[in-house]
């Protein structure tokens, strides 16, 4: 991938982008094999690769500069503002809207927040695009309600220029610290969620719910999990750390009941709405801590799917899964290092199948799907 920001050494987030993409995949595959299954008899399936540009559906932009010259991007290594509105990770429609927003913020006279002076208002622009419809969800993260009047006054111009913006909200984050968002979300549009489709499965995206940032690869991840689950054909399964329900919505079937557990209520609201749209009766969701949920259960279904955050399952949950003894565990991980640690603690289980998905090109990160069976 040719990236002027990387060449200039002003942005190094994609630290592998100077390597040919095929070489990145080969190296990553070798590294993952050495980490996950160096000496085990495991079925290692070919990786699912990504486009190397224009694959990302979400942008998190720091608002820098001044009201008369706002910049959406990051601070470079020298602490200088760097506009990333033309970042090659974003599809052209996202680049166009981000570039427009820089000028729109200037015209609206909205002062960027200055973390050194602790002055100003606008902290972040969070932009999500539906791969399926091309519609956008735009969130302004601001220090206070003072920004609302200027945003609302200039909103008609923005919507007229980009009618594909479906959801607009202002998130109030008043504290002076490196926190992306606050508790209060103020919607400026009647619509409060974005609709995405993966493999004909509707996925409702609300402002605070986690959603995969590489939709093409995520679609294949969910489809693969569904295939593996249908081979097992459990009558019941759990989806722990289910988020907006991507795995649960794909795996539920007339003869497979799924319970999805996620601590974030907004993500559960999205998952429940998606299930209603699909008309699935044997799919339920609850806003609970996954470890506390499993601790309250006397037994486990035949299959438990887990998709934890980067920190992994942790010793408490791995111990509970050991005790509950489901026959199969399907582990999807964005951090193979913590996954390997968790699997080592699941000593009653044997790894039988692995496939990785290049959700994060030009980095060392990968999404790994692993099937474990009880010995």
UniProtKB/Swiss-Prot annotation:
It catalyses: uridine(747) in 23S rRNA + S-adenosyl-L-methionine = 5-methyluridine(747) in 23S rRNA + S-adenosyl-L-homocysteine + H(+). Transmembrane segments: none annotated. Keywords: 4Fe-4S, Iron, Iron-sulfur, Metal-binding, Methyltransferase, rRNA processing, S-adenosyl-L-methionine, Transferase. The active site is at 334 (nucleophile). It comes from the Bacteria. InterPro entries: 23SrRNA_MeTrfase_RlmC (IPR011825), MeTrfase_TrmA_AS (IPR030390), SAM-dependent_MTases_sf (IPR029063), U5_MeTrfase_fam (IPR010280). GO terms for biological process: rRNA base methylation. GO terms for molecular function: 4 iron, 4 sulfur cluster binding; iron ion binding; rRNA (uridine-C5-)-methyltransferase activity. S-adenosyl-L-methionine binds at residues 212, 241, 262, 307. CDD domains: AdoMet_MTases (cd02440). Coiled coil: none annotated. NCBIfam families: meth_trns_rumB (TIGR02085). Catalyzes the formation of 5-methyl-uridine at position 747 (m5U747) in 23S rRNA. Belongs to the class I-like SAM-binding methyltransferase superfamily. RNA M5U methyltransferase family. RlmC subfamily. This is 23S rRNA (uracil(747)-C(5))-methyltransferase RlmC. It comes from Vibrio cholerae serotype O1 (strain ATCC 39315 / El Tor Inaba N16961). The gene is rlmC.
